[in-house]
Amino acid sequence: MSVELRRMAAGDLPAVLALEEDLFAPDTWTASMYRDELRRSDTRHYVVAENASGVVGWAGLIAYDDEAHVSTIGVARDRQGEGIGARLLDALLAEADRRSPVVLLEVRADNERAIGLYERRGFTAIGRRPRYYQPSGTDAVVMKREKS
């Protein structure tokens, strides 16, 4: 099934929240957090990946003149490994490159698949945040990519 990327809308939140719960519980964002992010369209860029069955992934970027930050990215478990996460990340990086000279992100230290994707896209680890993800207490690896 073909997957298309488009801007996230408030109507996507039920599907995004269901994926968020499946992928990231107990360290999930809330509906109010996402609604707040979507209202800040001047500095936020959120996209979803969808096919005929609905939303299969999403990603978000916070972008300022001096730096951008990948705030979230996720792909349905049954669609992982198909390149959807890479397409979502590439969409965020294209937007980040228009706005900012550097992109930062935090990734769960135990998420080797995501760390590998970020490294393939030019990110390097620059630090670690102990017990960053709450309530699980999982560490985060801080990664950085400078615009080439």
Task: Name each region found by the language model.
Residues 89, 110-114, 131-136:
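Short glycine/proline-centered loop/turn elements that form peptide/ligand docking sites
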Residues 3, 7-13, 17-82, 86-98, ...:
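Acetyl-CoA-dependent GNAT
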Residues 65-67, 102, 140:
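A generic structural signal for beta-strand entry/edge sites
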Residues 104-106, 124-141:
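Conserved catalytic-core motifs of GNAT/GCN5-like acyltransferases
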Residues 15, 116-117:
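Well-formed, non-transmembrane alpha-helical positions, independent of function
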Residues 118, 123, 143:
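Conserved active-site tyrosine of GNAT-family acetyltransferases
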Residues 63, 107-109:
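A cross-domain feature marking catalytic cores of carbohydrate-active enzymes
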Residues 96-106:
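Conserved GNAT acetyl-CoA-binding A-motif
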